[in-house]
From Swiss-Prot:
Family (UniProt): Belongs to the MYG1 family.
Pfam families for this protein: MYG1_exonuc (PF03690)
Protein name: MYG1 protein TC_0665
Coiled coil feature spans: none
Organism: Chlamydia muridarum (strain MoPn / Nigg)
InterPro entries: MYG1_exonuclease
Highest taxon of source: Bacteria
């Protein structure tokens, strides 16, 4: 007899793919956390409503998500299989599916299937999950598995929150892009950069963006492309580089000057008015106005 809202996965050492697969099923309220059964016993697995990363079968209809069998020739791990299943159910709109896949799940699939290895000095999500395994081999790993599971659930929850927030910001960015040319002016800090380029920003004439941050204002140069995000279309004057407070006030002649990054892509001002004054000064020096 099948146990409703249960999921089976293998015991022993765990990896990011089955941890992520279980986290997704829990997040979308398809299984209960206390009905995760970690085993390789085929009879026990047969009682589970869902089975991930064990069992030698991939079947959406039967809710079986293993990728180790020779008959499976796709590129997913159990994480990618479950994400696709949620998309197939209609629980994940296509845009959110693509977002979760590109930000996290695809990387899990690649690393689990041996197509990606982290370079020295870099630590991926999959590397972090692996670290939660017991240091000594052969022990009971349930405690550590559930610790890693909670971490994955928290991360996926935050990613979904960020996705929704970014989509709200995109509407604001679109409106500002339609009415501004040289500088995108925002009344609040928001996720502008990726949205700007996803909306055709490479061909937009804006060179700067301004917005409040706490009780100050930021004036930032816009990169030519998202891949070249540490560059800017129009840099601040070289003699502003790394200056603070009175030094920047002296260099700019603007009393509200606070800071200019040594990379000449970001500056901080004490008010909207000072920020606008700095913008006009830079544009004038560059011959834009």
């Amino acid at each position: 007899m099948q146990i409703p809202r249960s999921v089976g996965t293998h015991d022993g050492s765990f990896h990011a793919d089955e941890v992520t697969a279980c986290a997704l099923l829990i997040m979308f309220d398809l299984v209960d956390k206390d009905k995760i059964i970690r085993t390789r016993d085929s009879e026990k697995l047969a009682q589970c409503e869902y089975v991930c990363d064990v069992g030698g079968r991939y079947s959406i209809a039967d809710k079986r998500f293993d990728h180790h069998q020779v008959s499976y020739t796709g590129s997913w791990s159990s994480a990618g299989m479950v994400l696709d299943y949620l998309h197939h159910l209609g629980s994940l709109p296509h845009e959110e599916y693509e977002y979760l896949n590109s930000t996290l799940v695809h990387g899990v699939d690649e690393q689990d299937n041996g197509r990606f290895f982290s370079k020295e000095g870099f630590c991926s999500f999959s590397d972090i999950i692996k670290i939660y395994n017991p240091l000594e081999e052969g022990g009971n790993t349930d405690k550590e598995f559930f610790f890693a599971l909670h971490f994955a659930i928290d991360l996926l929850t935050r990613l979904r929150e960020k996705f929704r927030y970014d989509r709200i910001c995109r509407d604001v960015v679109k409106q500002v892009m339609e009415k501004e040319d040289v500088c995108l002016r925002f009344d609040r800090p928001l996720a502008w950069q990726e949205n700007f380029f996803s909306l055709g920003g490479e061909n937009h004439p804006a060179a700067f963006v301004s917005f409040p941050c706490s009780d100050q204002w930021i004036l930032r140069g816009i990169p030519p492309t998202l891949d070249r995000r540490m560059e800017v279309r129009i840099p601040f004057p070289e003699d502003w580089a790394g200056l603070l407070g009175d030094q920047l006030v002296k260099a700019t002649g603007i009393p509200g000057a606070i800071f200019c990054h040594k990379g000449l892509f970001l500056s901080v001002w004490d008010s909207r008015e000072s920020c606008e004054e700095a913008l006009n000064l830079v544009l004038k020096q560059q011959g834009v106005v």
